[in-house]
Amino acid sequence: MKRSFPLVLFLLASACASAPPRPAEPVHVVIVGTTDVHGWFNGHIETPPGGGAGVVWGGLPALASYVEAIRKENDGRVVLVDSGDMFQGTLESNMFEGEAVVRGYNILGYHAAAVGNHEFDFGPVGPDAIVRNPGDDELGALKRNAGLANFPFLSANMVEKATGKTPAWAKRYTIVRSGAAKIGIIGLSTPDTPNVTMGANVISLDFTDPVAATIAAAKELRAQGVDAIVVAAHIGGRCTKTDDPHSLESCDRQQEAVHLLEELPPGTIDAFFAGHSHSQMRHYINGIPTAQGLAYSREFSTIDLWVDVDNDKVVKSDIRPPTMICSFVYEGTDQCDPRSAPANAKLIPRAFLGNTMSPDARVAATVDPFLRRVAAKRDEKLGVSTTAVLKRGYSGESPLGNVIADAIREASGADIAVMNSGGIRSDLPAGELTYGDIFAVSPFDNYPAVVIMNAAQIAEMLRATTSGNRGILQVSGIRYTVDAAKDADKDPAVRNRVTSITLPDGSPLDPQKLYSVVMPDFIAAGGDGMADLMKSIPPDRVQIFYARPIRDTLVDVLKKWNRPLSPAVEGRITMLNLEPAK
């Protein structure tokens, strides 16, 4: 024993010498979050409504310069997360099924990303958005992207129906080191995923209660000794003001994220990055710092955590205002939103944390080849023009919705056309149109489907899409009226806000007649809450036309019309008692 004692002392001394020093003060860790990039790895060129200097807003090369500045400011103690819907939405991303975004994220150094509903949109690897050939894997494109990523795809509430376990290509959570702090990151997906993606692509998966999934994952992470837990969730909220993080007055308390956070026991998590709703959040909800920036790579969110690593807890937090992603700003504003630009304002370089922002060369070199490969198709002129911007709309009739509904109705020869507002992703700009303009409006690989329906089924379709927050159906061949105050106290499953449905001449639908209704195959497959209705319709009354996707059908009809498009709202949809935005 005497002879072994010096050896014990030596081993103890060696262990102490090799262990990292424990900081006397809390460790400051900065969490940076993006969400709903939707394939916009390149910036948007936008101009003020009244004319003037255009600005490039967003893009991964510009984002990289901000992230690097924050890393420099905080000695590298930065955790970078994304809250989902990374890939779907632009020609340059969709043509390569999201690969450009993954490769850009790899260079940026993301630590984790939540699985959003639109991650499933591409279906199998290749041009088909759903399985059409024996041996195709409906999750093939997503699995490929997960394999390319240097960071995990996370969802604690997504399980395989066959096993009840998380798919092999994803994880429930991950743990990263940031300085001396050990940070757990949980991912969540919206439980509504089967209704807001192509349902056939998630037929093997279940999306469970996110509250229970968060509590279970957090318990496991605490047992593994993490100092803080961050959630990246494709679950969102809506707040119209972000100036006072402690006031929820401007927030919709019925939104998914608010409900989830208010259900969590105290101390379950330490920070929450929301997504899915394309709106800003900067609020403490149930004591939890919660952040969400604008979609399409226009903003990022930041939460600062001060971590007591000796006691595995967060002792202080702060939510910074959402930060616009741009290398130039309008003088006197420190922002690049052209809607708020002063008249004739000039652009100046953006200063951030003492650094001048400019696109990161490494990220640009990674994504630029994808842009070059689609440039010719994107810039292809269609020989069609608009006299003014054709606006989309979510809660009422829109000029662009009318054009699309008219186009697919004419192309199909159907009696009636409906188009989900959520499938119209951009306004149509004024002037001569390109294929890229049409793609921005209709990026999803949806095809026209003609469904034979009776009057009661048409009424149920309109009822279901006006009973909640999904966005109403744009129409051609019918008119309808919605009273937003009607049945407010009823559950959305039975709420009926539709007060009238007529043909364009004002006559009612014939209850004994069958009508042909053209719609995106997404709706025909049960999307946007249509599952129960579509199951009630015999399969031989549904025909999907795979020859041309809706965007190319739109191009064909616009060329056939051969006339300038002018915005027009014609009274197809009448909205009563619609509350103005706060």
Model regions and ranges:
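Catalytic centers of hydrolytic enzymes
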Residues: 24-34, 39-72, 107, 196-211, ...
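Loop/turn elements at helix/coil->beta-strand transitions in domains of secreted/extracellular proteins
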Residues: 26-30, 74-79, 108-111, 148-153, ...
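Bacterial signal peptide processing site
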Residues: 17-19
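C-terminal motif of bacterial Sec signal peptides marking the signal peptidase cleavage site
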Residues: 13-15
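Core catalytic region of metal-dependent phosphoesterases/phosphodiesterases
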Residues: 60-162, 261-265, 293
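Divalent metal-coordination and catalytic microenvironments
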Residues: 36, 63, 85, 113, ...
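Functional cores that coordinate and move charged inorganic groups
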Residues: 141-142, 146, 171-183, 190-353
